[in-house]
Amino acid sequence: SPSRGLGDVYKRQLVAGSSSHAKAVAEAASKVQGVSKVLVSTSDAFSALLAEPIAPLIESLVKSKSYTHVVAGHTAVGRDIIPRAAVCLDSSQVSDIIEVQGEDTFVRPIYAGNALATVMSKDGVKVVTVRGTAFDAASAEGGSASVEEVDAGEVPQPTKLVQEKMSESTRPDLATASRVVSGGRALKSSEGFAKYIEPLADKLEAAVGASRAAVDAGYADNALQVGQTGKIVAPELYVAVGISGAIQHLAGMKDSKTIVAINKDPEAPIFQVADMGLVADLYEAVPELTEKL
C-alpha cells in the first residue's frame, strides 16, 4: 500500500456513486485494513464516474476537512478525475508514482520507464496518482472503519453519459490477471490473434494483451493494449509473442515476475528483459506449445 511512509495520511477513503451502489462499496471499503474512515457521497450524477461532478466534491472535502493529500489509482478513471481535481485545488499533480519516500516526496518513472524521477511537491495539497502494480494490495478483510455520509449538495452536470458499452469476456481482466499472453504485429491479422494467441491464453487461463503496433494495425482491440499509453501490467507470467519490444511496450510490462518471449529475431529488444526466450517462428512454436500444455 502507498500509505507506507505517510503515517495517517491515507486513512480516509472516498466513495462516490449512485445510492444503489455506493453504500455497498463503502461497506466493503470499511473492511480494508488500514482505513479508519470511509466518506460516502451519493448522487445519480456520480454513477458514470465523470470528472465534472466528482472533482468539485473532492475539492469541497479537502477544503472543509483540511486534508493534505489526494490519492487515486493511475487508472482510466483516476487519469480523468484527478487532473481536474488538481486544478480545482491549485495543485500540481504527481502522476503514476511507484514509491513513496515521504509525505511530500515520490518516485515516478519517466522516459517510458527508462529512468526514475524523485519528485518533491511543495503544494499545500499533494495530488497523486499511483501505479497499482508497484505496491502490495492491502487486505480486503480485517478492517473496521467507520462510514460517514457526506452531503453531495448541488452537483454540477455540464456533461452526461450518453452510452456505455461493456465488453464481455470469459478471460481474466488484463489489468489484474496473474497471467498474460500478448501478441504483436507479427500476428499479421485479427485472425492470427484468434488462431494463435487466444488458444494459448485459454490453456494458461490468461488474459490477452497486445502491443500498440498490433492495436494500431487493427489486429486487437484498444482495450488490450499493453504499454506506456495502454495498460501497465505486472503479472506472475507474461508471454510476449511476436513482439519486438519497443521501449513503450516494455514500460507497460517489464515489472512482470516472469517474462517469456517468442520471436524469430534473436536481436529483438524483448529478449533483453525476458527471463526465458525462444528464437522461433511463432506460427510453428505457439501451436506446439499450446498442444503440450
Set out the residue ranges of the language-model regions:
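Short internal beta-strands
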Residues: 11-18, 39-40, 207-211, 260-263
